[in-house]
């Protein structure tokens, strides 16, 4: 009697293996539902469990081992069960690898199958053990829903009385029941019970995380990657693609506790610029990008804005300014005072948005925080009156510290603050040069120059982008050269302004000095750094003007500037210091 039972059992095992390998749909109709659990021990004739359908996976670099265990349809504690089940996950993967390697040992109450799936989705949701002979369509393999893997519906429906239907060649699973009691329980239930899937870390999928970060726009593997870094098992009854849909439209997903924001759109970067206006250092995303946006906006000088991280050069805008009248130039610089963090754009978009905001471009400057380029307005501004110039300077008074992008991004936003570009020089810390404004201001009347300088006094420390970037803080204050060039060591750019000053009359330079001086007297607050700036201005600026400009006018200008440095630089430093600190 015993030998007959063994023979029948071995025969059933052979039939089941053939059904699993060939994908037949009727391999186990004649077998008893408890045949897999009656004689689990001591039978070497049952070595077929060890071979376990070694079909090679054609999926990309990974196979999913699904530890399945049975849960009621109405069971709300499956998360708790999944956590309990998680303790044995690593041990089961080891066993599964051993048996997939061809070991002939019998695993008690466990059945494994390697995928024969050609699907690109590496994670397969679960078959339903349905007593009625039909499988739920809701929890089938998402790869089947995508049409990428062979369907296992008919197979699972015919294997409904046994747990060997887990061998369905569309689904790679490992029976998670640690005892025959679960099998008996599953078979005893007339209701459909869901087989939850617990996914485990695969060495190849940690690589997929890197690939998904590189792709940044492809979220097919986001769920797998996210769950694998957290080393958690997926126990949701929902198909995997639903989780992808939840996370797909969002650019933010956590990997290893890091918040990765993938905003490639300029509109998103515009929002970041707005956030900077509120004091958010959103551009601080990667200090490594370190935009050295050197904008030497002198009339003839093309601003080679080197976004070193992105290597784009915005020479065009400066050329446009060449044909503009001096009045326009000053206006444009005032617009910059309004807080052209636009040039900062967003290092992500890496487009150097140079906004030569000509006279009255207040509205443009508001949009400037959004990274829009206001080059068009400059041409329109050509016909504008000097009164418009003063207006944008007032707008700057509102305190656009926008240029203060993020010292980490170290984008040197040069703000061509027209008259009294003290604030620009403050922002010079990122190497932005306010030479342009000085040149522009030359053609303007002393009144106009003084007005924007006062606006700057209102605290355009916006240019004060990031002291870390250590961009040369060359502040070539327009007339009178209040050039409190703190970072004189970095003042390689000051040549331009001096040359431009050569064509200017000496009378113009002292007058704007007075204007700026009068405007700054009322607003000076703290002169902590006055001594340093005076020394730098007195020595370095003189040397620069003498070397950089061969004309005698430049020398005269420096003399006037040096005469007033004591009084002007103190006030100017006082204006900068409270804001910078």
Swiss-Prot record:
Residues 1-23 form the signal peptide. It is found in: Secreted. Residues 138-157, 174-194, 324-333, 366-396, 481-497, 505-529 have a biased composition (Polar residues). Residues 24-62, 132-157, 173-194, 271-581 are annotated as: Disordered. Keywords: Repeat, Secreted, Signal. Coiled coil: none annotated. The keyword Manganese does not apply. InterPro entries: Semenogelin (IPR008836). GO terms for molecular function: protease binding; zinc ion binding. Residues 291-310, 334-344, 412-425, 455-464, 530-545, 558-581 have a biased composition (Basic and acidic residues). GO terms for biological process: antibacterial humoral response; coagulation; negative regulation of flagellated sperm motility; sperm capacitation. GO terms for cellular component: extracellular exosome. Participates in the formation of a gel matrix (sperm coagulum) entrapping the accessory gland secretions and ejaculated spermatozoa. Interacts with SERPINA5. Belongs to the semenogelin family. This is Semenogelin-2. It comes from Pongo abelii. The lineage of its organism: Eukaryota, Metazoa, Chordata, Craniata, Vertebrata.
């Amino acid at each position: 009697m015993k030998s007959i039972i063994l023979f029948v059992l071995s025969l059933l095992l052979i039939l089941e293996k053939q059904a699993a390998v060939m994908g037949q749909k009727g391999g186990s109709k004649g077998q008893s539902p408890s045949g897999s659990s009656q004689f689990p021990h001591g039978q070497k004739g049952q070595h077929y469990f060890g071979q376990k359908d070694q079909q090679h996976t054609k999926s990309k670099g990974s196979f999913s081992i699904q530890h399945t265990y049975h849960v009621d349809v109405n069971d709300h504690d499956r998360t708790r069960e999944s956590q309990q089940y998680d303790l044995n996950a690593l041990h089961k993967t080891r066993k599964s690898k051993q048996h997939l390697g061809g070991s002939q040992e019998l695993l008690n109450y466990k059945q494994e199958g390697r995928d024969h799936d050609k699907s690109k989705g590496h994670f397969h949701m679960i078959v339903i053990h349905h007593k009625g002979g039909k499988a739920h369509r809701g929890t089938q393999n998402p790869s089947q829903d995508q049409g990428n893997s062979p369907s296992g519906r008919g197979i699972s429906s015919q294997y409904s009385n046994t747990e060997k239907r887990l061998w369905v060649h569309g689904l790679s699973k490992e029976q998670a029941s640690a005892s025959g009691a679960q099998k008996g329980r599953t078979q005893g239930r007339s209701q459909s019970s869901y087989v939850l899937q617990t996914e485990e870390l695969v060495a190849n999928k940690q690589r997929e995380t890197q690939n998904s970060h590189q792709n940044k726009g492809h979220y097919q593997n986001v769920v797998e990657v996210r769950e694998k870094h957290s080393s958690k098992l997926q126990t949701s009854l929902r198909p995997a693609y639903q989780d992808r849909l939840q996370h797909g439209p969002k650019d933010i997903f956590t990997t290893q506790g890091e918040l990765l924001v993938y905003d490639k759109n300029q509109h998103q970067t515009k929002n970041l610029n707005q956030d900077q206006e509120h004091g958010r250092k959103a551009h601080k995303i990667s200090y490594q990008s370190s935009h050295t946006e050197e904008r030497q906006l002198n009339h003839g000088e093309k601003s080679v804005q080197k976004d070193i991280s992105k290597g784009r050069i915005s020479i065009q805008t400066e050329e446009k300014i060449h044909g503009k009248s001096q009045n326009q130039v000053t206006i444009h610089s005032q617009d910059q005072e309004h807080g052209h963090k636009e040039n900062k754009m967003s290092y992500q978009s890496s487009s150097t948005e140079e906004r030569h905001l000509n006279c009255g471009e207040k509205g443009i400057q508001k949009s400037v925080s959004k990274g829009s380029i206001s080059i068009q307005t400059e041409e329109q501004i050509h016909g504008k009156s000097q009164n418009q110039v003063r207006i944008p300077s007032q707008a700057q008074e509102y305190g656009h510290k926008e240029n203060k992008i993020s010292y980490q991004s170290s984008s040197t936003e040069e703000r061509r603050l027209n008259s009294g570009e003290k604030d620009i020089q403050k922002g010079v810390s990122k190497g932005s040069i306010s030479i342009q404004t000085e040149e522009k201001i030359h053609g303007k009347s002393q009144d106009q120059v003084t007005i924007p300088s006062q606006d700057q006094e209102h605290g355009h420390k916006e240019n004060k982008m990031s002291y870390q970037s250590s961009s040369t803080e060359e502040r070539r204050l327009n007339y009178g050269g209040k050039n409190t060039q703190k970072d004189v060591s970095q003042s390689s750019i000051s040549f331009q302004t001096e040359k431009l000053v050569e064509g200017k009359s000496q009378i113009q330079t002292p007058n704007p000095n007075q204007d700026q001086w009068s405007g700054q007297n009322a607003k000076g607050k703290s002169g902590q750094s006055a001594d340093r700036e005076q020394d730098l201005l007195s020595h370095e600026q003189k040397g620069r003007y003498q070397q950089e400009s061969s004309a005698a006018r430049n020398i005269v200008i420096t003399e006037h500037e040096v005469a007033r440095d004591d009084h002007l630089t103190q006030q100017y430093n006082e204006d900068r210091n409270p804001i910078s600190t």
